[in-house]
Curated annotation (Swiss-Prot):
This protein's name: UPF0178 protein Sfum_1097
HAMAP family given in the database record: UPF0178
Family: Belongs to the UPF0178 family.
Pfam families: DUF188
Amino acid sequence: MRIWVDADACPAPIKELIVRTARRLRIPAVFVANKFISIPDSACVSTVRVELGPEIVDEYIAKHAEPGDFTITQDIPLASVLVPKGVTVIDPRGELYTEENIRERLSIRNFMQDLREAGGITPGPRQFGQKEKQRFSDTLDREITKRFKLQGN
């Protein structure tokens, strides 16, 4: 079990929470980015810096994540690749991507992208605050607990 983090766009409070969770539960966490990121030093936390370029971080995570791992990302196309592989995918706001909802999320994302490209006005990202941080924490804890139970820990 490993936690993969699409770290370029991950909010700082979520990164901090992941580091604390990894230390507390001794789960390896890997922060993947195409730029320098500052992550506290820890035996179970590491960073991987990939080259600049579109989708390079996503490709790295997709290649290395295995069934039973966790990935934290807001990239829906990446989630749509990982979920069928048996990777638990959570966005930084605490939404769990599943076999049941990933196709709909990808369809909405593609529609909104088409709308933006056609010059349509789409809403910007919602504000990120304590409520979102708590929802993420709750979802991550719940999913890790499920995984430990499946493994008999």
